Amino acid sequence: DAEAIIKKAKGDNDLLVAYLHWGSEYRAKPDESSVAMAEWLIDQGIDVVIGGHPHWSQGASTYKGKPILWSLGNFIFDQDWSEETRYGLAASFELVENEVRAIELYPIRIDVSQPRLLEGEAKRLRLEELAKRSDADLADGVRSGRILVK
């Protein structure tokens, strides 16, 4: 079962990341089942939860001090019929003693199935939108493109 697999993986590894294909499509916030699953995974020992599938970038949260990126959105995709589906997010994680201390956010825009990093005002506006979708205590970090994890 999943609980036993996570427990074994936790014993064999310094950091566990769960990357899930989950959630309801075309929504700015995670659905209740995604929230419940993320919390359950962290309760079992997962250190970082990252989601995908909704085709929209969703915000960031923490649960018991562990980071959750609800959905990175699209990266290389051809859903150009919707403005929101033409955005995605890449992230990097700064580790200190096997714990996530910071997350760098790299918003992208997809043009003809090609991801391109946003810069300047476009980047600022996208991070502002993601901040609105994030937990209030993380909003300033999301706006800056660097979330500090406590």
Regions found by a protein language model. Give the residues of each.
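Acidic, metal/ion-coordinating pockets
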Residues: 1-150
